[in-house]
Every structure is written in C-alpha cells, then in structure tokens.
Swiss-Prot record:
Quaternary structure and partners: Interacts with the Hsp70 chaperones SSA1 and SSB1.
Transmembrane regions: none
Protein name: Hsp70 nucleotide exchange factor FES1
Organism classification: Eukaryota, Fungi, Dikarya, Ascomycota, Saccharomycotina
Keywords: Cytoplasm, Phosphoprotein, Repeat, Translation regulation
ARM repeats: 13-57, 76-116, 120-161, 164-205, 211-251, 253-290
Amino acid sequence: MEKLLQWSIANSQGDKEAMARAGQPDPKLLQQLFGGGGPDDPTLMKESMAVIMNPEVDLETKLVAFDNFEMLIENLDNANNIENLKLWEPLLDVLVQTKDEELRAAALSIIGTAVQNNLDSQNNFMKYDNGLRSLIEIASDKTKPLDVRTKAFYALSNLIRNHKDISEKFFKLNGLDCIAPVLSDNTAKPKLKMRAIALLTAYLSSVKIDENIISVLRKDGVIESTIECLSDESNLNIIDRVLSFLSHLISSGIKFNEQELHKLNEGYKHIEPLKDRLNEDDYLAVKYVL
C-alpha cells in the first residue's frame, strides 16, 4: 500500500523520475482501492434474482433484493441485460404466481422501469406469452391493492408508449377497458386516476387517432368518464391531464358529440375558478370548441 501511495503522489505531481522509482502499482490493488473489486452488474442482477426466487428467503430480504435489482436496471444496458441473462421469465413468474402483493408491486415497478424509453426492452418483454395480458388483468382488478394497480398502469404506459405494434396488441386485448372504471370511480385515489390518464395518453401518442379508435373510446365510456373528471375533481394535476387529453383529441380533428359538449360545459363551470392555475394552452384549446 505504501508503494501505491508513493506512485499516486508522484503521478499527481507529474514526477516521472519518482514514478519510475516507485514502479507500477499492482493492478489488483488499484482495483480494490477504486472499488472495482466487487462483482459486476450482471452478476449482481443474477444474485438479486436468485434471492427473490429462493423460497427460503423472507419477504423483507426479497424486497431489498428487488430494490437492488431496480437500481441496477435504471441503467439502459443493464435493463437490456434482463433478456441476455434470461431473467424476464423468473420476473414474470413472480408477477403472476406470487401470493404476496408487495412482491407483485415490486415486479411491476421493475417492468415499468426496464421498458421506459427503451425499445429493446419493450421488444424483449413482448417475447414472453401473456406478459401484456397479465399487466392488463392486474390493472383491471379492483381487488388488488392501490400500489399494485398503480404500478400496473405505470408498467403498461411505459410498455406501449411510442411503440405502435405493442399499442395495437394492447388495443386488441381490450386494454382500454381498464381506464374508464378508474376514472368514473369516485373512491379511486388521485394517484391511480393519474396513472390511468397517463396510460390513455401513452396509447393515443403511439397510434393514429381515427374514428374507429374514438368509437371504441366512446363505447368503453373513456371519453365521457374523462370529461366527467372536470366536474368531479379538485386535483389540479388530474384536471391538467384531462385537458391535455381533450386538447390532443381536438388537435387530431375529433369532434365532440352533443352529450360530450354538454358535460364539457358543466365541467368548465367547475374549473373556471382554477383556470389561472391550469395549463393555459390546453384550457383555451378545449374552451374554444364550447
């Protein structure tokens, strides 16, 4: 260690003669000194998953392993390594088979983080049968805890965002059906409603909005329940997201029907006192059609 210290001082001073006298440091010692002696990220990912899948490990330890795994896959390369290390399958096993909702929520959070703005991971996830269907079913299940459903919506939003093919599969699996019940539920927490609107926005930003899609949104009650949020909500974030969604429809050339316009008028009476605290462009864009 003393030799390493002498070399380091000489190196920082640019003293080539002193560096020559000290000689080259031991690479292993350098690695230890600068924290490079531990396992690499892929190894840590595999070790974390082994802990998660071990039936003898207690819940708290598994949740810590999930936290460690998620921190690792915030790195894009590590997220893509989930496929290379064959870790999607055990992760999906936890998602579907676990009886512990905390573990299910942790698995959903990892899925959402891994596929966020990551085309490779989006495609990798879709290689596994029923992965998308499972996310939709969990998001739709009113018996699931708030944290689980919220993270299911988070995972779905990130999975379909900016991906036309996955968005179309989401549509064919009736994924839009999980949105309206949340928005029309007066007991639903604001966080869940915001995630539902985020999913709706992610879908619409990934496909061409046409009359067929609008027809389905009307049939499923999505447009009506979204508009009704303007009358029922005092949460500014939710109101802003609703206005953004409606403005998106308007900019796509969609015309509201008579019933929708009536509900919009009622909603605007409710939010008018809040207008100075809302997104001005969206507020005016929607008001213009009234």
